[in-house]
A protein has these predicted regions:
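Feature marks short, surface-exposed loop/turn motifs that line or immediately flank catalytic pockets
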Residues: 13-15, 101, 170-172
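A conserved pocket-lining segment of Rossmann-fold NAD(P)-dependent short-chain dehydrogenase/reductase
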Residues: 50-68, 92-107, 117-141, 165-167
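C-terminal substrate-binding subdomain of Rossmann-fold SDR/epimerase-dehydratase oxidoreductases
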Residues: 122-262
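N-terminal Rossmann-like NAD(P)+-binding domain of SDR-like oxidoreductases, especially those catalyzing
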Residues: 1-98, 229, 236-237, 250-251, ...
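Glycine-rich, phosphate-binding/catalytic loops in enzymes
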Residues: 22-27, 110-113, 147, 182-183
């Protein structure tokens, strides 16, 4: 069987915290936040030279800096596929997806992300548990836009041999996300910020999408569309699993969710 093209499903996790910028010392790639830093509620990253709080840059394709086993495995998949594609003459592209959301996102996978967790919690009367201080930012992209990105690089020869970010390029804080969920559902949704954090979480993860835009792609749907489409799909499924508290308890028991000190 002749292989016409390979598209590798990668992740923005390959960037770790990505590149930061210090007003005095310029750009740098930070190390992960230490347990001691997180326990003291020092959520933001600091310059490695002067220890001043630094500003996150958009995640650009050239600044990979994976920390955990998932991120390392994704970057290894990319390099393996792109390298073998070059050697064997098989057109290959890697797509680094941001947090992909929308209809048919699993209602049962405890690790399927903020959309399922917040929406399911709100619809079942549970508070939305927000880690750290809620000001950490993420990049959310609609599944329809991800599909369109895959189709574009599948048909565009200029994409071959490259890695591309697929996201919205828009910073959304977790608190902003929670407020939008409350606005959409229309009931008295409660937030809870208990001063806890998840081990291994990045502080900010927002992708630059300029490279893929150069091929003619751009996202057509925003976060409001994501939640509308997800809520409409949930109504069609006819039920919400009552497993949110079990997932939260499981993560606490496993040492994934930890409490910071006041």
């Amino acid at each position: 069987m002749k292989i016409c093209k390979v598209i590798v499903a990668s992740s923005q996790a390959v960037y770790g915290e990505g590149q930061y910028f210090c007003q005095e010392h310029g750009p740098f790639l930070p190390v992960p936040r230490s347990p001691q830093q997180l326990q003291r509620k020092l959520w933001e990253l600091s310059c490695c030279k002067c220890d001043r709080v630094a500003n996150p840059s958009l995640l650009a394709e050239q600044h990979t800096n994976p920390y955990n086993q998932y991120a390392v495995s994704k970057l290894a998949q990319e390099k393996t596929a792109l390298g073998l594609g070059w050697i064997h003459g098989i057109p290959t592209v890697a797509l680094r997806y941001s947090i992909t959301q929308g209809p048919r996102q699993s209602l049962f996978n405890h690790y399927s992300g903020i959309c399922r967790i917040f929406v399911s919690s709100a619809l079942t009367g549970s508070p939305l548990v927000i880690y750290e201080d809620g000001l950490q930012t993420r990049d959310f992209v609609h599944i329809d836009d991800v599909v369109n990105a895959n189709m574009l690089v599948l048909e565009n020869d200029a994409a071959e041999g490259h890695a591309f970010n697929v996201g919205s390029g828009i910073r959304t804080s977790v608190v902003e996300y929670a407020r939008l969920v409350r606005d959409k559902i229309g009931n008295q949704v409660e937030f809870r910020i208990p001063g806890e954090y998840r081990t291994g979480d990045n502080r900010h993860s927002v992708s630059s999408i300029s490279k893929l835009k150069g091929l003619g792609w751009s996202p057509k749907k925003n976060l409001s569309d994501i939640l509308d489409d997800f809520l409409n799909w949930i109504q069609q499924t006819g039920g919400i699993p009552h497993q949110i508290r079990d997932a939260y308890s499981h993560m606490k028991e496993a040492g994934v969710v930890l409490a910071a000190f006041d």
